[in-house]
Amino acid sequence: MIQRPTFFTPTHLLAMLLATFVLITGCHREAKKNADDGMPVEHLYDKAHTLMKKGNWAGAEVSFKRLIAQYPYGPYTEQAMVENAYAQYKSGKHDDAVSSIDRFIRTYPTHHNIPYLYYLRGLSNSNRDTIFLRKVWSLDLSRRDLSAPQQAYNDFKTVLDRYPNSRYAADAKKQMTELRNMFAQYEMNVTLYYLRRTAWVAAAGRANFLLETYPQSAFQYDAVAALGEAYTHLGNKTLADNARQVLQTNAPDHPWLKGKWPKYPAAIRKLNPFAGEKSAATGQINAVVDSN
């Protein structure tokens, strides 16, 4: 019996071509995915470290994580964990960096890189959520929740207290000073809020708190001026004169002495929740905030 030849319709041919393409693509992806499988740990580390030196933070993070997954223990793994946290920090993934650092500190509490990791955690905490705010709204960072910056301050303090001779101690101290100024600015913001609303007692209380908690901050003389303003309106001439004398001695150019401080924004500007007030002492912008 003679069999008739089989003919493929265009539909059959297209289906076969698609199936072949999917098979080839899948094999290629699998080969690419497993390219690093079985690679010696030192080669994996060199690859990740090279990516990091080139500024390819995302690629470095992927490679470091692959090394850690394949080789959970050992000196290369420990170094990979440290550098992975740095790559996450440089990528702006500050929450991930803090998580990686915390995990390392719990696992290797006596590691020689612990001072560096506390320092890096301070940098990560001080930058949490700030990049987006700066780029989108240019918000005054002293207006936001201060829990992360406060944790950053504690991280830098740990470096200074526990590892005073480490190479990170000097910059940790500098970072602490900058954070203290930000905390002081937050208190100044609230003080200005109360002054503008003629809540003189509350304004004086907040200004005193600033001076007691953050002495020598960049906003100390603004706080003294706020005390002078509040006590003047409260009719306490003695305390108002004391504030005036402090300014005349230490900040004789402060505009409050000439009746030109504080300057409140125009009524239409008050409607803008992101409007700010300039510090007479520093020229910085003090954003207006509602107190808790």
From Swiss-Prot:
Q: State the source organism's domain of life.
A: Bacteria
Q: What is its main location?
A: membrane
| Subcellular locations according to the entry | Cell outer membrane
Carries keyword Kinase?
no
Q: Where is the lipid attached (N-palmitoyl cysteine)?
A: C27
Query: Where is lipid attached as S-diacylglycerol cysteine?
Result: C27
A Pfam family: YfiO
Q: Which GO terms describe its biological process?
A: Gram-negative-bacterium-type cell outer membrane assembly; protein insertion into membrane
**Entry's family note:** Belongs to the BamD family.
What PANTHER family does this protein map onto? OUTER MEMBRANE PROTEIN ASSEMBLY FACTOR BAMD, SOLUBLE LYTIC MUREIN TRANSGLYCOSYLASE-RELATED
What's the name of the protein? Answer: Outer membrane protein assembly factor BamD
- Name the source organism: Xylella fastidiosa (strain 9a5c)
Gene symbol?
A: bamD
